[in-house]
Amino acid sequence: MDSGTRPVGSCCSSPAGLSREYKLVMLGAGGVGKSAMTMQFISHRFPEDHDPTIEDAYKIRIRIDDEPANLDILDTAGQAEFTAMRDQYMRAGEGFIICYSITDRRSFHEVREFKQLIYRVRRTDDTPVVLVGNKSDLKQLRQVTKEEGLALAREFSCPFFETSAAYRYYIDDVFHALVREIRRKEKEAVLAMEKKSKPKNSVWKRLKSPFRKKKDSVT
């Protein structure tokens, strides 16, 4: 499914300084298809062989909801253990795609470990996350139901997709959804700050009430 992603240097590039950069991190057990998803998104190409222990970084410039976006995507190795390098990209990342394979129940169970790893570093449950069940084309090998994925996404309060990197099903949707989550949470944070900085009308009215009474008594 192609929703219009274009590589860097396409007609979608925006004037210098206007494109917002989004730092996205791919997480998940080895062999679930993180690299295949990323490469399909970036170059519309399915890698026939890839070393799951290699970490790669990719960049692409696209438009999402008619807004330009520079995506800086880190495709991590599949180990969930805590390391100094992982601590750095957990802090720097603005949004996370946590992947499992619908053909591998163990990879589904490891999703919680990656979610806990995000919380361990960032100390907040409000970090933008998208949950992905990959390899949806391998229905005959399915070990994790779609309902289980939906239930876990509800627990995480995040978007959920079942994808096929092999056939490019819903690949663009995943990355677009994560950028939308980042934008939404940024807007919520700005509104919260604006609300906090404004004096509450009820407090202001209460402070003014004695002066109003004095004025009324004088007249």
From Swiss-Prot:
Protein name per its UniProtKB record: GTP-binding protein Rit1
Recorded consequence of changing F82L: In NS8; results in increased ELK1 transcriptional activation
Subunit structure: Interacts with AFDN, the C-terminal domain of RALGDS and RLF, but not with RIN1 and PIK3CA. RLF binds exclusively to the active GTP-bound form. Strongly interacts with BRAF, but only weakly with RAF1. BARF and RAF1 association is dependent upon the GTP-bound state. Interacts with RGL3.
UniProt cross-references to PROSITE patterns, sorted A to Z: RAS
Catalytic activity: GTP + H2O = GDP + phosphate + H(+)
Residues binding GTP, per UniProt: 28-35, 75-79, 134-137
Annotated effect of mutating T83P: Found in patients with features of Noonan syndrome; likely pathogenic
More about this protein: Stimulation of the NGF and EGF receptor signaling pathways results in rapid and prolonged activation. Shows rapid uncatalyzed guanine nucleotide dissociation rates, which are much faster than those of most Ras subfamily members.
